[in-house]
Amino acid sequence: MDVVEALGFNDPSKTGGSMLTYTLWTTPPNLGEPLNIIISNESDPRVLEETMLDGGLYNYLEAAAFGNQCFGLHMGDKQQANLGDGLTNQTQHTILRYQYFRNHFLGTCLESIYGGNHIRVWKQYSSGAYFLSSSAEEDSTDNHKLGLNAYDAGRDLFVGNATNIRVQGHLEANQTFVGEVSKRGWKYRTTVRYIEDLVPANRTNNHHTSVQAIGGYVSDGLVAVLTVQAQKDQPGLWSEEVSSALGL
């Protein structure tokens, strides 16, 4: 068993896939963005279910402050990914945006105005793991273009939100973080390990090379692998349900 299998996913490049998304209408063609976050199949089975109910994946992602786009309106092109699971290119399952103040009514609307983080989600059906592409974008006055270090910043902002730990500075391969977040009566304990040698650090086949600093790289080449455990939090309190209904 190699290190990737031990971490709970299959390396797409071993079976004809890629750790870069496929983005339409790029110049030159066929450029993509790094799949820089993986939710391991070693996670709690309920977290691997694509549902908001019963502690599922989308409840976890909202616990990390990521939700549906403002009023359900889609902004930006959809992307595809080939995860080497025999399905060739599959379209992203969803795109979720950062919820300012963790408010699930207006939080993503503020992200659309002021910029911030967003994630695209795919499932690798051969392993059951989820692959995410995360990047940080500028505000609406800059047409939401990606800024310097957008891929690494987006990845680390997501990890920070999922663990309640501030992730900053230069990261190393095998560096780990462990932390907890809660949502709708479920507590999630996330163990994060950064691994190398999955995505290219240079500009080869990377879209949005404007994120690359002069003399630097498009990305540090690290992927954050998350193993998420879930358990019932305090019994659902009436006050919690009211707060949730108010988007708090």
Predicted features and spans:
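Cleavable C-terminal sorting propeptides in eukaryotic secreted/cell-surface proteins
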Residues: 219-248
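Mature extracellular/extracytoplasmic regions of secreted and cell-surface glycoproteins
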Residues: 1-219
